[in-house]
From Swiss-Prot:
Displays ATPase and GTPase activities. The lineage of its organism: Bacteria, Pseudomonadati, Pseudomonadota, Betaproteobacteria, Neisseriales. Belongs to the RapZ-like family. InterPro entries: P-loop_NTPase, RapZ-like, RapZ-like_N, RapZ_C. It comes from the Bacteria. GTP binds at D57, T58, R59, S60. Signal peptide: none annotated. Pfam families: PapZ_C, RapZ-like_N. This is Nucleotide-binding protein CV_3336. It comes from Chromobacterium violaceum (strain ATCC 12472 / DSM 30191 / JCM 1249 / CCUG 213 / NBRC 12614 / NCIMB 9131 / NCTC 9757 / MK).
Length: 280
């Protein structure tokens, strides 16, 4: 059996993620107390369900604290358990609650949305350590659905390398394990003819392909990842996220990420271009 747990901050897109899994054929349950997971999984096994997705968050109350032990117990039963932790920048969450006019689940008399977000972050600190983080601050609903499906489709028994480009002007992604800054490299943005393209397009590839500094940065990042990857593999991690940023997240970082992904193509690799997904 396979169990995907969806957790994270309110307003970060957990409902979108759960619906994406439902569309992919998972039997989905929203807001099940952590302590009820073993009993529920035994029942789903009797029913013949193989792919289960369940959201577990602060609505579970005190039982949330038992989640780490519950997850370990399910794994010892041979269940493939993975947890996706969705989050976003506080200012993004505040804006989302304002736009939707929804009430934060932890808000009450005298507690602001900002304070509710901080409280929820504290309550979920231990849960965050259990899973793969997805920063949805700059993601559209369609992009989030796509990312969730890709993560779930990856082989959970192998370490997945996630290569992610981003723009510093939009903020550093919170879900990155490594962050590299490519803003020191030549920027094709200042050439009006190159500006409309991205790092995946031939004109930008030609622009960078003969540049020594660009080649050296790619080689250095590649060497560092190759050196330390076995160490991270020993931690029984499912995912390792390597992020490269430039100013806007359109040219330099995209080009470098594409090259790194090709360099590690013999491994399980996922590619994300955070700013290219913003409008899709």
């Amino acid at each position: 059996m396979r169990l995907i747990l969806i957790s994270g901050l309110s307003g970060s897109g957990k409902s979108v993620a759960l619906r994406a899994l439902e569309d992919s054929g998972f039997y989905c349950v929203d807001n099940l107390p952590a302590t009820m997971l073993p009993e529920a999984m035994a029942m789903y096994d009797d029913f013949g369900y193989q792919d289960i997705a369940i959201s577990v968050d602060t609505r579970s109350g005190p039982s949330l604290g038992a989640l780490p032990q519950v997850v370990e117990g399910l794994k010892t039963q041979g269940i493939d358990v993975r947890l996706l932790f969705l989050e976003a920048k506080p200012e993004t969450l505040v804006k989302r609650f304002s736009e939707t006019r929804r009430r934060h689940p932890l808000s009450g008399s005298g507690i602001t949305v900002e304070e509710s977000i901080l409280l929820e972050q504290e309550m979920l600190a231990d849960v965050l350590e259990l899973g793969t983080r997805i920063d949805t601050s700059e993601l559209s609903a369609n992009a989030l659905r796509s990312w969730v499906r890709e993560l779930v489709d990856a082989d959970g028994n192998r370490l997945t390398l996630i290569f992610e480009s981003f723009g510093f002007k939009h903020g550093v992604p919170q879900d990155a394990d490594f962050v590299f800054d490519a803003r020191c490299l030549p920027n094709p943005y200042y050439d009006p003819q190159l500006r409309p393209f991205t790092g995946r397009d031939e004109p930008i590839i030609d622009f960078f392909s003969g540049n020594k500094a660009v080649a050296e940065m790619i080689a250095d990042i590649q060497a560092m990842i190759a050196k330390w990857l076995p160490c991270y593999g020993k931690e029984n991690r499912s995912y390792l996220t390597v992020a490269v940023g430039c100013t806007g997240g359109q040219h330099r970082s995209v080009y470098i990420i594409e090259n790194l992904a090709r360099a590690f193509s013999d491994r399980q690799v996922l590619v994300r271009h955070r700013q290219l997904y913003r409008e899709h």
